[in-house]
């Protein structure tokens, strides 16, 4: 918050007046963050040579956060789910909706991998996407806990194996 106040040269009360309230500002931040992330990930999926390559690279990107930051912060959406889902029903629904959008993107990648013959088509892509989204959330928690690179790599390998 302080970075935002410094960048805008506003006080807290002025910032909240511009956006309606602290709650509305937070909701707008989640929407903006998730829209930007979704567009980026969707473009990544389109650019990858296969659906499985997208899934693999996404898992590795999450696992490698430990190498990019001394204090990994995780994902804004995942952190918000953990922090707010019990306390605020409206925010909980916004976060669930955003999560489902990402699950749909993963389902698209899984379906593509199935069509390409890289994953078995026995399983429902949407159900596998829920598993993958949950696995990524757990992987992010492991990264934040500073689990070793070797253990993170093993989690990635097992997650990929489970999708087959």
Model-derived segments and their meaning:
Residues 1-24, 28:
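Helix-turn-helix
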Residues 28, 42-73, 125-132:
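Hydrophobic alpha-helical connector segments
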Residues 31-38:
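Short, basic, alpha-helical segments at the C-terminal edge of helix-turn-helix-like DNA-binding modules
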Residues 53, 89-115, 126-130:
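Amphipathic alpha-helical packing segments from all-alpha helical-bundle domains
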Residues 54, 69-90:
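Amphipathic alpha-helical segments used for helix-helix packing
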Residues 57-65, 100-116, 135, 142-164:
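C-terminal peripheral helix-coil segments that are non-catalytic and often amphipathic
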Residues 78, 122-142, 158-162:
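Hydrophobic alpha-helical segments that form the core
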């Amino acid at each position: 918050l302080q970075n935002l106040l410094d960048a805008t040269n506003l006080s807290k009360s002025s910032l909240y007046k511009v956006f309606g309230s602290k709650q509305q500002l937070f909701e707008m931040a989640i929407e903006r963050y998730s829209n930007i992330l979704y567009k980026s990930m969707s473009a990544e999926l389109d650019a990858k040579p296969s659906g499985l390559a997208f899934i693999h690279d996404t898992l590795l990107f999450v696992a490698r956060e430990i190498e990019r930051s001394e204090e990994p912060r995780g994902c804004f959406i995942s952190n918000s789910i953990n922090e707010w889902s019990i306390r605020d029903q409206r925010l909980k629904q916004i976060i669930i909706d955003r999560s489902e959008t990402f699950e749909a993107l993963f389902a698209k990648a899984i379906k593509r991998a199935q069509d390409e013959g890289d994953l078995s088509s026995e399983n429902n892509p949407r159900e596998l996407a829920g598993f993958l989204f949950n696995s990524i959330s757990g992987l992010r928690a492991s990264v934040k806990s500073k689990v070793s690179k070797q253990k993170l790599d093993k989690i990635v390998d097992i997650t990929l194996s489970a999708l087959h």
